């Protein structure tokens, strides 16, 4: 039959690229699970009363090429002015070797958080390097890797200061008046829910204030002044006040380490180590503290440990501090960090080394000195005598200066009274400085760079002698070897080879949605039109961003059934926090601020109680019944008991147990009946899109994990984006911003992120995904995700019982395999199975969540039947191995499972095991072999012998 032109054009071609199983494979799986079609399967599984009659109207699909052309036209509306705004954001030069081999490399950006250290040694090493950079530059003992942005790090520093403070009755936090305004904004938001009073004043007046538990100072103030706080910090320490210092990572190359001056906590943004501004993010924040406070630190800490053979190996240390274990008692609700961006920054430091970094920092400072000398020579006054890269220039005709700057396509900082701010960076050239002279002085200034350079080279007093660094930095060999591109390329490849990412195998982590991150989706993030914009540039210069964000928000509104979307939160946990704050402020607006009880099912993700606690709520746990569903009787009892104090419920749908609960609407009705709001966690949105929606179900607010459902890659543990969708009554209470008015938002609430649109530069990924899939493709993706999960469940059911099922024995988009009976019978645990899967070439499913002793599997729609069968065959082969242990063919203490994973060096060592080398490393005929580089980690050793900086290079070899 002859095809029509429309059929030949095939605008939906990407749908088939994104969805792994083709039509024939889908039919084979449907036959295996006993369903006639995708629609029939969905109809059996999803409760009838929440199924959408028609899919959301987000348009028809577009090809990869058409979508890229459309987005390129939108991006071209952004105006790329040269930015001197500063305020914590500068232009950068990302080394091409890092751009090509990391940022554009799926071996780096598709990996997951390194909870399985045996398959994560490469990025763990890069993160350990990031911690070493932080330790060397801050002068402190312990560093994490990493936090979401500088402002979030400031809020975490405040919370940590209160945790460790010996002044238990003090409830005031002092912030120096010259911190960045966005930092103060986020600190105030966090302080409100904790009940802290924030005092903002000149730093030298801090001692005038009583009952202060912590102080936040900024080493280089927001308008550029370098502060020597040595004496002040000493006085504050004598009064037992915890001192936090915000620092500029590039300035720290030249300036005294705040830790050496006595600071307890030092943090800042690592953005200017190679990460583009990207209209606000994503960027990694560094965070360091004194050793005595290490167990109170937020964020992930990479530690050096040993594997089962005694070899040096890396792991995430002290995880008992984190939300997935401590829940509401966690130090922070942070789940996502900024691993990909932290690794870019760490490799930037590796590539340039201490000599290269000093040259870059000195060049920036020299150009700033030259600019300052020329302006002063012509009679302009600088507000500060001591500076690194930022001048605050007093100008009589400010309007005229700004007009000339705009004509020259230059952005200066304009919010300073009777002055302009100018921040230089590593991209600044001689020509740029001459252009700045013309803007500030007129074209006939008569200044010459070389003449000015001679003057300042002999007489630069802009950094106080006491503030000049006198110690060596980055002395570890890793920072002093890889300076040629060949060496750097090979080093990065050696790290990449140690890790398991989606470019090698499926990553079946339940509750994580490790789906395809398509190349076409990733291409726009490095376009200069998106990468080079400052988040505080004038809005008329960001019309492309505004259009793209507005379109994406409109699509998300339609897909979620909500009325508005706020793009600011830059992680799922931050989205939870923002959504709960919206609920809190909504209640307060109705004079019901006493509503502070948050109901959370026992099965909830650890971020839920941690976020509720951070939002100033009390957590009350609701029981689950024997089928894993919310116990309605217990829910009613807890809601009635809370009464007028009920704030909300946090519920995940489909449930964390991998089932579409039949009573979800009734759950919403019960909570609404008692005046509460419904927060529907968007973690499992991949089983809703196009089929149902949170708004249609009856929820009031949700966060969306764009790094799960909408294809932003996990990056080895970040970046992420967690925008929140809200019903109209909550829209006035979503986060605002103190620097930038967010168009269309009437909100006056405080910010939760440093930038108004969070990690804006990765939003094009989700825009591309929705545009290329269209309504038809998005629904089909959800349906195939459900099909793939049910196919795995049905084929593994006899070997590994599925713990929870819904109607007709079906699961949603993930399933929980119960290992407890096997462990009781044979002694083989879920940990043993997880590690043995590595020998078969797979990342393990999620272990012991949400139920201890289980494995939760989520295949996503992107995996083909071939890959699903490979995983199933591996699991069945492992079950046969367990039977060998059960039959005493292999002893419990010496078998392929308890000894897994196996590494190459074992093949040439003495072999005393009761199974062959072939069984160990090529089980069941595994051909495309992934080789882990370490054996099973010794977690106890790692936490008892905490070591979180770089080890001798010989230990890596």
From Swiss-Prot:
Cofactor: pyridoxal 5'-phosphate
Key word Oxidoreductase present: yes
Entry keyword annotation includes Acyltransferase: no
Cellular component per GO, a single term: glycine cleavage complex
Pfam families reported in the protein's UniProt record: GcvP2_C (PF21478), GDC-P (PF02347)
GO MF annotation: an example: glycine dehydrogenase (decarboxylating) activity
UniProtKB keywords: Oxidoreductase, Pyridoxal phosphate
Top-level enzyme category: oxidoreductase
SUPFAM superfamilies: PLP-dependent transferases (SSF53383)
Gene3D superfamilies xrefs: Aspartate Aminotransferase, domain 1, Type I PLP-dependent aspartate aminotransferase-like (Major domain)
InterPro entries listed in its UniProt record: GcvP, GDC-P_C, GDC-P_N, GDC_P, PyrdxlP-dep_Trfase, PyrdxlP-dep_Trfase_major, PyrdxlP-dep_Trfase_small
Entry's Gene Ontology BP terms: glycine decarboxylation via glycine cleavage system
Reaction catalysis annotation: N(6)-[(R)-lipoyl]-L-lysyl-[glycine-cleavage complex H protein] + glycine + H(+) = N(6)-[(R)-S(8)-aminomethyldihydrolipoyl]-L-lysyl-[glycine-cleavage complex H protein] + CO2
Modification N6-(pyridoxal phosphate)lysine occurs at: 708
EC number: 1.4.4.2
Family classification: Belongs to the GcvP family.
Biological role stated in the UniProt entry: The glycine cleavage system catalyzes the degradation of glycine. The P protein binds the alpha-amino group of glycine through its pyridoxal phosphate cofactor; CO(2) is released and the remaining methylamine moiety is then transferred to the lipoamide cofactor of the H protein.
Subunit structure: The glycine cleavage system is composed of four proteins: P, T, L and H.
UniProt-recorded name of the protein: Glycine dehydrogenase (decarboxylating)
Organism: Shigella sonnei (strain Ss046)
């Amino acid at each position: 039959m002859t095809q029509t032109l429309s059929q030949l054009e095939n605008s939906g071609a990407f749908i088939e690229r994104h969805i792994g199983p083709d039509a024939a494979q889908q039919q084979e799986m449907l036959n295996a699970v006993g369903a006639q079609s995708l629609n029939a399967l969905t109809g059996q599984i999803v409760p009838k009363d929440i199924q959408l009659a028609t899919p959301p109207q987000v348009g028809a699909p577009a090809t990869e090429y058409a979508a890229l052309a459309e987005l390129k036209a939108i991006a071209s509306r952004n105006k790329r002015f040269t930015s001197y705004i500063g305020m914590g954001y500068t232009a950068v030069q990302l080394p091409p070797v890092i751009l090509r081999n990391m940022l554009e490399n799926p071996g780096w950006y598709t990996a997951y958080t390194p909870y399985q250290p045996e398959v994560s040694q490469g990025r763990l090493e890069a993160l350990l390097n990031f911690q070493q950079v932080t330790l060397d530059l801050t002068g402190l003992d312990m560093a994490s890797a990493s936090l979401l942005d500088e402002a979030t790090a400031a809020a975490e520093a405040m919370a940590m200061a209160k945790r460790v403070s010996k002044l238990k009755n003090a409830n005031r936090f002092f912030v120096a008046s010259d911190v960045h305004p966005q930092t103060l904004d986020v600190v105030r938001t966090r302080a409100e829910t904790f009940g802290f009073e924030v005092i903002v004043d000149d730093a030298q007046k801090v001692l005038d204030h009583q009952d202060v538990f912590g102080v936040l100072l900024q080493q280089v103030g927001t308008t550029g002044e370098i502060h020597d706080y040595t004496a002040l910090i000493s006085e504050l320490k004598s009064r037992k006040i915890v001192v936090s210092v915000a620092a500029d990572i590039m300035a720290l190359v030249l300036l005294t380490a705040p830790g050496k001056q006595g600071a307890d906590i030092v943090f800042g943004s690592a953005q200017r180590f190679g990460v583009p501004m990207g209209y606000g993010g994503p960027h990694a924040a560094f965070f360091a503290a004194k050793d005595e406070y290490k167990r109170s630190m937020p964020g992930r800490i990479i530690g050096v440990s040993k594997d089962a053979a005694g070899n040096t190996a890396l792991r995430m240390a002290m995880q008992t501090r984190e939300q997935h274990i401590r829940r509401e008692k966690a130090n922070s609700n942070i789940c996502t960090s900024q691993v990909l961006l932290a690794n870019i920054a760490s490799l930037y430091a590796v590539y340039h080394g201490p000599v290269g970094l000093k040259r870059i920092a000195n060049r920036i400072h020299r150009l700033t000195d030259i600019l300052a000398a020329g302006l002063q020579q012509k009679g302009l006054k600088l507000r500060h005598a001591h500076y690194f890269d930022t001048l605050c220039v007093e100008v009589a005709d400010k309007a005229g200066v700004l007009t000339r700057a705009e004509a020259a396509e230059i952005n200066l900082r304009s919010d300073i009274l009777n002055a302009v701010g100018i921040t230089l960076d590593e991209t600044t050239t001689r020509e740029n400085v001459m252009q700045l002279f013309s803007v500030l002085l007129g074209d006939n200034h008569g200044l010459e760079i070389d003449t000015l350079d001679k003057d300042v080279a002999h007489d630069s007093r802009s950094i106080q002698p006491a503030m000049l660094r006198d110690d060596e930095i980055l002395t570890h060999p890793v920072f002093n070897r890889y300076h040629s591109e060949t060496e750097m390329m090979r080093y990065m490849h050696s790290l990449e080879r140690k890790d398991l990412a989606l470019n090698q195998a499926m990553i079946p982590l339940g509750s994580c949605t490790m789906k395809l991150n398509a190349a076409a989706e990733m291409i726009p993030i490095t376009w200069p039109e998106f990468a080079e914009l400052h988040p505080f540039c004038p809005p008329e210069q960001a019309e492309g961003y505004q259009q793209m964000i507005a379109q994406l928000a409109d699509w998300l509104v339609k897909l979620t059934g909500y009325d508005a979307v706020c793009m600011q939160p830059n992680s799922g946990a931050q989205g939870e926090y923002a959504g709960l704050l919206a609920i809190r402020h909504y209640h307060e607006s109705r004079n019901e601020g006493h509503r502070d009880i948050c109901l959370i099912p026992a099965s909830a993700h650890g971020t839920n109680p941690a976020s509720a606690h951070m939002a100033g709520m009390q957590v009350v746990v609701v029981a689950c019944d024997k089928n894993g569903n919310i116990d309605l009787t217990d829910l009613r009892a807890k809601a009635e008991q809370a009464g007028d104090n009920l704030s909300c419920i946090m519920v995940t749908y489909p449930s964390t147990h991998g089932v579409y609960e039949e009573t979800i609407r009734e759950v919403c009705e019960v909570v609404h009946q008692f005046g509460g709001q419904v927060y529907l966690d968007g973690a499992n949105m991949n089983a809703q899109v196009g089929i149902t929606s949170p708004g249609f179900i009856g929820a009031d607010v949700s966060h969306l994990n764009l790094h799960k459902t909408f294809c932003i890659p996990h990056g080895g543990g970040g970046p992420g984006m967690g925008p929140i969708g809200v019903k109209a009554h909550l829209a006035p209470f979503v986060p605002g911003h103190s620097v930038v008015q967010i168009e269309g938002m009437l909100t006056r609430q405080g910010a939760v992120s440093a930038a108004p649109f969070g990690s804006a530069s990765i939003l094009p990924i989700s825009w591309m995904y929705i545009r290329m899939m269209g309504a038809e493709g998005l629904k089909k993706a959800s349906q195939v995700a459900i099909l793939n999960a049910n196919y795995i469940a049905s084929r593994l059911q006899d070997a590994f019982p599925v713990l929870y099922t819904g109607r007709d024995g079906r699961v949603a988009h993930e399933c929980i395999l119960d290992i407890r009976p096997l462990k009781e019978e044979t002694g083989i645990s879920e940990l043993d199975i997880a590690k043995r899967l590595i020998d078969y070439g797979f990342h393990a499913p999620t272990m012991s969540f949400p139920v201890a002793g289980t494995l939760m599997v989520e295949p996503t729609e992107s995996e083909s039947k071939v890959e699903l069968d490979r995983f199933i065959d591996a699991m069945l082969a492992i079950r046969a191995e367990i039977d060998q242990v059960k039959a005493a063919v292999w002893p419990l203490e010496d078998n392929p499972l308890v000894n897994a994973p196996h590494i190459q060096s074992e093949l040439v060592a003495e072999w005393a095991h009761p199974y062959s080398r072939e069984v160990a490393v090529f089980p069941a005929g595994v051909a495309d072999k992934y080789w882990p580089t370490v054996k099973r980690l010794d977690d106890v050793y790692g936490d008892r012998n905490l070591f979180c900086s770089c080890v001798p290079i010989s230990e890596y070899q």
